[in-house]
Every structure is written in C-alpha cells, then in structure tokens.
Regions:
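Cofactor-binding beta-sheet edge motifs in enzyme active sites
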Residues: 1-315
Length: 315
C-alpha cells in the first residue's frame, strides 16, 4: 500500500467519520443493472456503466463527457480498450445518457481529493460518498481538463481492467483451467497449452455472472498498446457524413425557437421596439422585451432569425 499522505489521512477521517457506519450500503459497486435499460440493445451485455459488449464482439465505451474538439470520445475509449486488450477496430462509443447513474464521482473526487491516496479498505466507501453527493447534484460536466485525468484514469481504465478480469475468469470457469494460464489479445481470450480460444462476445453470457472486482490490476506504462499511440478518431466519420447529432439537432415535442438581440453596450436598455413590423410574419409566435435584449419566438429558427433582423429596436 502506498504511504498515506497527510491530505489522504485527514480526508479519510472526515469522510469516513460520519459515514463509515453505512459500510457497503453506500459503496457504488457494479451499477450495470441500473443502466441496462438506458444503454443496452438486443444482443448487448452491460459489463459496467462505462462499457457494453455485444455478441458480435463489438465493444462500446459509454462516454460521460461532451466532445468539444478535444478528442475525448476517442481518448477515453482508448484507455478503456487498452486495459481490456480489445481489438481497436471493434471498439465504438456512445454518449452517456443524462441520467443520475452517470453523475461522475471520479471527477468530483479528483477535484476535491486531488492525488490523495486512500487505503483500499476505505476506497469503495469514499467512492460511494462522492457518488451519493454528485447524484443529488446531477453532476455530469465537461471541463477543467478532467476527462482523461479523472474519468479516464479512475473510471475507464478500471472499468476496462475489471471487464477483462471477468472475461478471463469466465473462460477459466468454462474450460476448467487456471486463470493465470489465460491471456487476452485483440478481444480474444486464449489458452495456449490446450489451444482453446473464445471471443469476448462468446464469453459474455458467462462473464456476466462473474463478480466484478473492485480493485482490478491495471497495466504499467510499458504494457500499454493503445495509450500513448495515435489512432483515428472515432467521432470523425459521422461528422463527415452528417450523421453526428449536435446540440442544435435536438428536437422535442412542441419545441419552439428563439433568437435574441442584446444591447450593444453593457448596462444599456431597450428604449423602444416596434413589434407591429414582424408580429404578423409567418411562424412568429411572440416578441419579448427582456429589458436589456429583445427575443423573437417562432416555430422555426429561420423564421425567428428573419423576424429579429427586421425588428426596429432602439437601445
């Protein structure tokens, strides 16, 4: 066990002092069953909240961060896949749903506890404390360079390593061979002496019954096969073809559009606005004087934008 830092010791005392009595009840554990209905389709098994495996051997990384040009969809998938020894050509990603189970305690823990190292016997309890807190806040954010250093290191890598351990154990139980004799390579588990092998997808039914390890062994830097390499970004093809969904593509029943013209100088107010000019324009529903800005609400964006441009506004 690593040497306790003063920060870790104080943090453990504060956090555990009031909640350790709850014990296992507040530990996050494997929440796969709680998100299966949100992310799994037919033929897919949710190994943990960060990944699912299909019978056709496709691995899907569930990414809880927004893509803003930083390549996080690919980077986090690489970290997960590397720990699994997965075939990168069979890895894809999906964005995590806006659900409480995806409130990211790894990010909260990273910002608050920093690099503090807690003893293993407290680790799961502390994770549970942070999970309880972030779920109450619906804490699912992107920022602060947190995606790789917190979610990647403390969620994706652990999720990948845990899934690999479960797959190896499933093969060991099925073939009646020591788990130490098994290796995983490119989404296939192999037993050299007997010549037996099976894809991750083939092992999924058995692996789903294996208990999830809370502290799976992570690779050393020398063992990385994907991390630290340059790989084609997973999000680019859909952006090129136009299939990718952006925030502005989202539509909900009864949705309307608004465009706003704000005062050109900080502190100035709307002096006058002639609503008669555009109120009869097709699709225009309402013109709102916000005091420091004017908004036009319409059935469509272009209708709102066109009407706003026609409005005579004096600030």
């Amino acid at each position: 066990m690593k040497k306790w830092t003063r920060r870790a010791f104080i943090g453990a005392g504060v956090l555990a002092g009031g909640t350790l009595v709850l014990g296992i009840a507040i530990r996050p554990g494997n929440r796969a069953s709680k998100v299966a209905g949100l992310i799994a389709s037919s033929g897919e098994t949710v190994m943990n909240i960060w990944l699912k495996i299909a019978l056709d051997n496709t691995i899907t990384a569930i990414i809880p961060h927004a893509e803003m040009g930083q390549g996080v969809h690919t980077a986090l998938a690489m970290m997960l896949a590397d720990e699994m020894d997965a075939d990168w050509s069979k890895v894809k990603f999906e964005e995590a749903p806006a659900a409480k189970e995806y409130a990211n305690y790894s990010v909260a823990k990273g910002f608050i506890a920093g690099n503090a190292h807690f003893p293993k016997f407290l680790d799961e309890t502390i994770n549970g404390i942070f999970l309880t807190a972030v779920k109450s806040l619906n804490f699912q954010i992107t920022g602060g360079s947190a995606s790789v250093r917190f979610t990647g290191q403390d969620a994706m890598r652990i999720a990948g390593a845990a899934a690999k351990a479960m797959l190896l154990q499933a093969a060991s139980d099925t073939w009646k061979v020591p788990v130490e004799e098994l290796v995983a390579e490119k989404s296939v588990v192999k037993h050299a002496s007997s010549g037996q092998s099976a894809t991750f997808g083939e092992l999924i039914p058995a692996a789903a019954e294996v208990k999830t390890p809370s502290h799976p062994k992570l690779k050393s830097q020398a063992e990385f096969t994907l991390m630290g390499t340059s790989q084609p970004r997973l999000d680019i093809p859909a952006k090129v073809t136009g299939e990718a969904k952006f925030g502005m593509d989202v539509q909900v029943p009864g949705m309307k559009y608004a465009t706003i013209k704000a005062a050109p100088v900080f502190g100035s107010k709307v002096k006058s606005v002639d609503t008669n000019v555009t109120s009869s324009q097709p699709g225009v529903l309402k013109i709102v004087n916000l005091g420091e800005a004017v908004a036009v609400i319409a059935e469509g964006y272009w209708q709102a934008k066109t009407a706003l441009n026609m409005l005579p506004i004096t600030f």
